[in-house]
Each structure stands twice: as C-alpha cells, then as structure tokens.
C-alpha cells in the first residue's frame, strides 16, 4: 500500500465558480501531509474530495481498494437539549465494545473523560475525543480539518504531539488542513500550499524557499516559527 490515494487533474466547480483548479498529487502510506492556505483557498473542499464526500467536477480520484479512512471535522455541533456522555458519543454508529473505546481514549490521554458530558468539555478535550473516535476503525488515512482551531499555543502543541504519537502507533497517513504555520512545519513530511490550485508542494525545507510560500507566509525560520496572520 505505497500510494493510498492518487488525485489526477481534479477540478471542483460550484456553479460557475472554480473552487479547485487542476489538483494533482499522491498520498503515500505513512506520510504526514499538511495542506496550507488562506481562508477560502479550497482546503476543506479538497479534504472532502479525498474522503469521497464531494465528487470532483473533472479529474480522477484513485484510492487503494482496501483503504480505511477517518475524518476529524473542523467543527462539530451537539444539541444542548440531548444529554450525551463521551462514552455514548464514542459508541454512536459503532460496533466496538466499551473496553475498546476506553483503550482508544487512553491513546490520546483522555480516558478520564469517558463518563463526562460532551457539553462540558473544553475545545481541547473535544478535539482529543474526536481524534480518539477517528481511530476506532484502525484507519490507513486520517484527515484532520483545522484540528487546532480555537486552541491556544499550548493546546496546539499538545494536540500535535498526540497526532505525532498516533502516527507512530498506527503507521498511518495523516492529512492536516491548516491556515496557520505555528508548529506545523516541524511536524510534517510534506507541505502543499493551496490557493484553489497547488502553488508549491514538497518537504518543508524545499517549499520554505519557494516564492509562492514566501509571498503567502513570509520567510520561514526553522528556529523561529513563522506565524501567518489572518483575519476572521
């Protein structure tokens, strides 16, 4: 399972608006790939194409026939009128036994949350639970859409350390969608700079000198993490 996903000349249109323009790259087994780009660059759309949630308007998406994937969404909403514990949430649409759920919570240092209400969790705790739930099917590929959104720097460091830990345990491929550098460059094998089309693609060292990367993020210093300032 060397290449688990192969995207060839992918285009996505919403009406006449071009969201993704001629996207081609391969996802290799065991690699961590970060897709960087500003808001509105098509990052989440690309993630959904990879997951099969959106069909491309043109182009070809080839997946390994035995590929198992998991998705950690950017946001998840819980109805405050419906009481639900972490344990119940972990078991929704799941055939896994309680002890297995507990085991996967342990992997992300969140086993103490098992009986807590999902409504009472912090942003960082919810991300841990979502990450744990993404492991239940023992995926070959995990796609994380803006996993550190709303977390402070310390929370981001903790979550990225957990992602690195999971990568080591499962030897799976991971795609991280982001618009911030922060610690991403130190935690990834390959980087794709996206703004509807791929502006540059390669190892962090290779793309950090690329004109398109510098235009988007400024000069990257490995000793001083560059931070892309964005507006909400």
From Swiss-Prot:
Residues 5-220 form the ABC transporter domain. Keywords: ATP-binding, Cell membrane, Ion transport, Membrane, Nucleotide-binding, Translocase, Transport, Zinc, Zinc transport. One of its GO terms (biological process) is response to zinc ion. It is an enzyme of class 7 (translocase). One of its GO terms (molecular function) is ABC-type zinc transporter activity. It is a peripheral membrane protein. Its EC number is 7.2.2.20. PROSITE patterns: ABC_TRANSPORTER_1 (PS00211), ABC_TRANSPORTER_2 (PS50893), ZNUC (PS51298). It is found in: Cell membrane. It catalyses: Zn(2+)(out) + ATP(in) + H2O(in) = Zn(2+)(in) + ADP(in) + phosphate(in) + H(+)(in). ATP binds at residues 37-44. GO terms for cellular component: plasma membrane. Part of the ABC transporter complex ZnuABC involved in zinc import. Responsible for energy coupling to the transport system. The complex is composed of two ATP-binding proteins (ZnuC), two transmembrane proteins (ZnuB) and a solute-binding protein (ZnuA). Belongs to the ABC transporter superfamily. Zinc importer (TC 3.A.1.15.5) family. This is Zinc import ATP-binding protein ZnuC. It comes from Wigglesworthia glossinidia brevipalpis.
